[in-house]
Amino acid sequence: MKGLVRLLTVFSLLLGCWGWLGTTQIAQAGSLQSFLVPQIPVLAIERQNRADAKLATEFGEKIDLNNTNVRAFQQYPGLYPTLAKKIIQNAPYGKVEDVLNLPGLSDGQKQLLQSNFDKFTVTELEPAFNEGDDRFNNGIYR
């Protein structure tokens, strides 16, 4: 009896795998047009955040006394860290010349600042550059 069950099982599997001996239907390729969504042109505008917009102005080329961090002053001898710290702590400024009114500046420091006026600019305070303590420690360590 077990032999008959095995033979019947093997025969039915072979018959099923052969597809009833060629009686299967031919596969028809479907059209993709029924699945495609019609293409509609989208008019997109270039989005830019306020920080990127500010970097495209003078801010990206000069030191902005209201928004730049302390490390930016390293490239100018004599400004980092003492004068840079004073400048940042007493911001905001209305114009570049206002930096000469800082309390406790010596005549030498004032002359140093005046000699670098062409490297400074003043723009409105931007929260993206002033939030937290990023102006004092922007997390760049060497």
From Swiss-Prot:
Primary localisation category: membrane
GO biological process, alphabetically ordered: photosynthesis; photosystem II stabilization
Compartments, as annotated in UniProt: Cellular thylakoid membrane
Transport listed as a keyword: yes
Signal sequence region: 1-29
Keyword Ribosomal protein: no
One GO location term (cellular component): plasma membrane-derived thylakoid membrane
Membrane topology designation: Peripheral membrane protein
Keywords: Electron transport, Membrane, Photosynthesis, Photosystem II, Signal, Thylakoid, Transport
Residue ranges of the TM segments: none
Pfam families: PsbU
Function recorded in the entry: One of the extrinsic, lumenal subunits of photosystem II (PSII). PSII is a light-driven water plastoquinone oxidoreductase, using light energy to abstract electrons from H(2)O, generating a proton gradient subsequently used for ATP formation. The extrinsic proteins stabilize the structure of photosystem II oxygen-evolving complex (OEC), the ion environment of oxygen evolution and protect the OEC against heat-induced inactivation.
Subunit field text: PSII is composed of 1 copy each of membrane proteins PsbA, PsbB, PsbC, PsbD, PsbE, PsbF, PsbH, PsbI, PsbJ, PsbK, PsbL, PsbM, PsbT, PsbX, PsbY, PsbZ, Psb30/Ycf12, peripheral proteins PsbO, CyanoQ (PsbQ), PsbU, PsbV and a large number of cofactors. It forms dimeric complexes.
Stated family: Belongs to the PsbU family.
Protein name: Photosystem II extrinsic protein U
Gene that encodes it: psbU
